[in-house]
Amino acid sequence: MKVVNLKQAILQAWKERWSDYQWAINIKKNCPKGATWDYLNLAEALLEQAMIGPSPNPLILSYLKYAISSQMVSYSSVLTAISKFDDFSRELCVKSLLEIMDMFSNRLSCHGKAEECIGLCRAMLCTVVWLLQGCAWYCERLRDPNDFSALESSLRACLERMANLLHSTKNRALVHIARLEEQASWTNVEQAVLKLTENLSAVTNPTLKESLEECVSLVKSIPQMLCLQCDPPVHTTFPSVHAFIMLEGTMNLTGETQPLVEQLMMIKRMQRIPAPLFVLEIWKACFTGLIESPEGNEELKWTAFTFLKIPQVLLRLKKYPQGEKTQDFTEDVNVAFEYLLNLTPLLDKADQRCNCDCLSLLLQECNKLGLLSEANTATLTAKRSEDREHAPRLKTAENANIQPNPGLILRAEPTVTNILKTVDADHSKSPEGLLGVLGHMLSGKSLDLLLAAAAATGKLKSFARKFIKLNEFPKHISGEGSKSASVRALLFDISFLMLCHVVQTYGSEVILSDPSPSSETPFFETWLQTCMPEEGKTLNPDHPCFRPESGKVESLVALLNSSSEMKLVQMKWHEICLSTPAAILEVLNAWENGVLSVEAVQKITDNIKGKVCSMAICAVAWLVAHVRMLGLDEREKPQTMIRQLMTPMSGENTLQFYHERVVIMSSILEHMCADVFQQTGLSLRPAVEGQEPIPYRNLLPARLPIRQALQSQFRKVLEKGWVDSHAFHLFENLLHMGGVFWFTNNLVKELLKETRKEWASRVVELLYSIFCLDTQQITLTLLGHILPRLLTDPAHWHSLADPPGRALAKLSVWCALSSYSSHHKGQASARQRKRHREDIEDYTSLFPLDDTQPSKLMRLLSSNEDENSMLSSPGDRSISSSLSASQLHTVNMRDPLNRVLANLFLLISSQLGSKTAGPHTQFVQSFVEECVDCSEQGSRSSILQFMPFTMISELVKLQSLAKPKTVLSITDLSLPLGRRMAAKAIAAL
């Protein structure tokens, strides 16, 4: 039956005055088998015939009402038919259409196929346009005083239906899907809104006008449905921000600024921290770090981090794109400083430690960078000066002897740039001038200040490259006298010492460059990789690098054993350094076999350290590797040689800057030997009261199982409420010693012990910051091993009950989002890049996913089958049930993190479909809720893209997730299939 025949049937029924049920019986008899009334446009045909005259045909309208009541026609087809009527001057017709809408507008739903649900979305969008156009038409006519009351009544009728439609979040969600499905149709909405807004001035009734404005506002809010955030948290302290800043200041001064900014923004977004409190937490952590850092290098590092790096971080935060910006970032910084001024004891303690007004210096730095206005800077400075009048002071004599580190660091920063320029210049003709600059750098704590300033401003790598180049310079010898030979020796020695110091203070990754096939690897890089002892690095004393040509070794031994002074002319220092370990081995063997006396060995070690300290460092580097291989009773003589090499020479016959060079050499050797001397309970130098020999070394308590050490330290941190530098170093040691799985698993067990909600929340924040020690690997372990075991083993389900279960869900989502975001942007921190671990799993073989073939995928997406058969039950591991947005976005499934996320969501999906409820399903619910709360809406970086589409229908069975906004949030609305699945789920609510 074609539509024309349908019209004839309607006319026949009207002529013969059939009742509504007679009409229904007769029309069904003549309808072709299998055809649907929507396909035949029954609703449109009935309305078309009913609305021919100036008033509606009541009999034909009764047929339509019967069809709606008996579900012969769908709501979407009726709404579409209504929206095609455009003659608003026929008020009776419009009134009848609105009454038809009233029959079902309060129960708009669809339980059919996804395509039918999308049809309902489109129909609702058309209805919104129609109602807006109707309101605009009546508003425009209100300017005419004739028939004012009738027009206002019609306007009110249209408005009531529109308000009824739009006040439902479900309806707005369906319109939102239609907007994404058909962008062109949304243009009609915008035009209708514009026309209505233009004519609002004609409405004189204030209540009516206010209602119209409210409806317009609701329509405009539809595109931003997912941007509306919940209220910010009520608490004012955020341990995760505090601890993350402590971690970065303690362990990652050399890290790039942008990854730090991204990570901070991720924390701010996930916890919805107000900007002033966020900035305040950063400053609180900086001041805490300044106060508690050990004297020496660590104190300088914290000073550089606080006064140089953090202002730059804030500058980038100011420029960071933020959607819902409510006020200027400079005002946020100002408010944060006002809050900070209330923490007088913290500021006083920092001022005492640094011997200066720390806050005033920070305010000046922020003002220079445009983070604070002049007026605010002056007000805050005056307030702090007033508070300092009552602060406890150090004694005047003590004050006079202490130069404030913040001032020194701020002055060192421009000096770094000048030194880089100086070193870059051509010194081949007169290297003496450069030697003077280097000598000045060695005096006092100048070198440490310059290195800290360079590290905080991202110039340390450039600094190191320049000194590696300088270390290569003495290789080139051409007819030289004794003066130029000594200058060449000093240039080599000072650059070598500086580079060793940089490695021990900031890590070898600062020095090592990316391998280039064309250029030769510099000497120092080669020596560093093969010969230099570092924490956690074991060297083989029999490695070929310690065994150069025997002829060179013999001549060096003879030179060291002679009574005459070592000649510097034509000396190839790089070769000497490489030959020194073998020469030391010869000397040690001779001493152990009674060929050499103690006095003879002392003379040889004096010769080694007498001119260039680099030789002593190379000798001790090998001795440390050698001692590690010996039993405790065999170590006496090698350790005696180490002590001899560490003791400075007292004679006058030494090269320039000897005292300064020896100070650095002693520090380098002390770091090298700390581990081997600790094993025998010996020390290299007498301990100074109140000062650790080397900060953060040997933190693990003796004779205590590492699990107990971990539990004990974590309990201390939990009671304290924040993680200090000492704790971070201890946690890192435990992470290295126990491995990623052991570390993560035991800390998760600590979390699952917490049965109090507020304590469980605190544990989450602290664990998140501790896991930043190696976010990527810990996240892989947490999501790939620990959660699957807890979810699949019924014996563990009880531990997933709230509150610890919800806390674990929050922690898992935070880790997953942070890892995915930094991984997605390729921003692993230097601290994480440098780790080499043997316990890292091969996640590709561990989780063999069916890497969906594109041809299969396209066949699946173009299928016209019912979704119930296309997307089978979650328990089925077929290709269709595992289909997720990530596969349609062609995300690389061979990447470990992507693979683990995909498998976790498959597991969660199967748990939901297993029909067994319990704490594990409660955990799944919490996990998805956290994903929705924390994810950036509309972002491709959301981990929800790994969720199978079939999981949506299972999630809406959980009461707390059966919300339109939640469904919109968990589906990828940029994909047609995502929109269909969302429409199907929402339309059924």
From Swiss-Prot:
Source species: Danio rerio (Zebrafish)
GO MF annotations in UniProt: transcription coregulator activity
Entry keyword annotation includes Flavoprotein: no
Leader peptide range in chain numbering: none
Motif (LXXLL motif 5): 787-791
Keyword Nucleus: yes
Protein's UniProt name: Mediator of RNA polymerase II transcription subunit 24
InterPro entries, sorted: Mediator_Med24
Pfam families on file: Med24_N (PF11277)
Family: Belongs to the Mediator complex subunit 24 family.
